[in-house]
Amino acid sequence: MEINYFISAKATATVQNINVSLSAEYQKDQAPEVISVVANGYLPNGENQKYMNAALKYNTKSSDFDSINGANVDLGIIQEIVPLITEFYRKITETFTNY
């Protein structure tokens, strides 16, 4: 039996009062192929506040989302999350060159 060990990376941020959690699992010296994102909170649109709840899977090879699921998903906020994903991925891959 072969046991595979994975490294788990996690980060949190806030985008327009929406809580964003990023996570990835990967093997040593290999970049993660998928970054998972969970975003939830009240959308900043005045009196009729709606609660956004989104689960996203970002494919690092195609630089695109494999899936976007949830309720009241605001694409403007998703666009603001993309730079967070890019920074998260960059910081993970930087660790390979720092050893």
Language-model segments: which ranges?
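Viral virion structural and adsorption modules
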Residues: M1-S21, Q27-V34, V38-Y99
